[in-house]
Amino acid sequence: MKTGFNRRSFLRNAGVGSSVLALGPLAASLATSTAASAAGAADFDTIANRVGHDSVKWDGALRNEHIDHVVAGMGIADMDYKAAPAITAALRKAVQYDNWGYIDMGQPGRKAWLKSIVDWNHKRYGITAMNEGNMAITTGVHAGILATMAAYSPPGSKVLLATPIYNGFYGDIRATRTVANESLMKFNNGRWEIDWADFEAKASMPDTKISILCNPQNPVGRAWTKEELTRYGEICLKHNVLVLADEIHCDFISKGSKYVPFASLDNEAVVKNSITYKSVSKSFSLAGMKCAWFFTTNPEVYKATVFHNHADLNTLGMYAAEAAYAGGEGWLNDCVAYISDNHDFANDYIKKNIPMIKVGQKPEGTYLQWIDVTAIADKIGAKKMADDANQQAKDAASKMGTDYSGRAGMAEMRVQTPEDMVQHWMAKNAFVQLNAGTSYGLGGANHMRMNIATSRKTLKAALDSMAAATKKISA
């Protein structure tokens, strides 16, 4: 990882060559600002005011739930904290330049930029299988996954998933006209575990071509062990199923748990039968910057994925990512520790104060809680509410001469689930927005996903509001 700042290297890494010498003030001051910001203590008790800034998490909650205020947006997976100071400083300097045309990623700076990513992964995660020759840049993990799917999972083939799992994968599956091959995990002693017999049975189906692994697992919070990943990989290798490892949440590991990169496994054949996707977007809350990458030790998989990877790089995203690596590691370490404590706080609070919500063991990874809302759904009659909403939509569609479809793409015509009703109820009664569990596949029924990457004060306010709302219906 780079520890200092080199003006020429910075310009090269931006891919704009000597024509950007007007960025001299940026280059001259970035090292100082990065070092200064890295030295200061991070403040996660003070969050950005995201309302009024078109935030999906906050403004989206107001718009979608038709409420006039929100105590906490706890849905989509981004963080409420102010960005690492090193990132903000770099971007402020970068926008002093007055032209945002195409950049030439064929310049020598591209190698320096890739090296900074490789160095970070070597140092922080011990991923020695990664190098500048077997990785490539893309705009996001989804874009990378779609590129691999285009090469290895033809329309109609099956995609193996251990569920509940990140709902975005289902969008990728629909986009590629493939089919989800779901293996429901077991919930044992408050912990989700793969049902290995079922997983292998699904992997052995002849039309199962790929398996998307989420490591750590969103939304259930498992940080997979070396033994679990090895078994996962060996089953997939045995049945000629390519592993697509989404490790975007890898930095958010709770105290006492460990992130094991799939590419670090001892079995070289298992590793070669995989491709890994990573990004700065979760670690440093840079989802809007569109900067990610993938790597694999398999030359064939690399070439095929690169061939289908039609994603360009966001210039500011590159500046932000480089600044994060140069001066953001301390901030990130503090952030991870703060979120681990948030998990403890949330688990303890819910167990003591919200008996209508059940939680399992503390999540080992991610900044997401997977909560059981069965009691709430039963109490508010969520199933009947969903049935009524679906019938009303069907009747309205019939009057318009339109076929009713749960996949119509129109909010008023989408099939509603009991979990959707709990989501709406929570928004209107506690003014807290959560994600409905059914969108995460098999095992999502009676569950909600809750994002705790916010200040302790906001987290407590949200839980207080949820406790008060559920208390009113608990009698």
Give the positions of each predicted feature.
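Conserved PLP-anchoring active-site segment centered on the Schiff-base-forming lysine
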Residues: 149-173
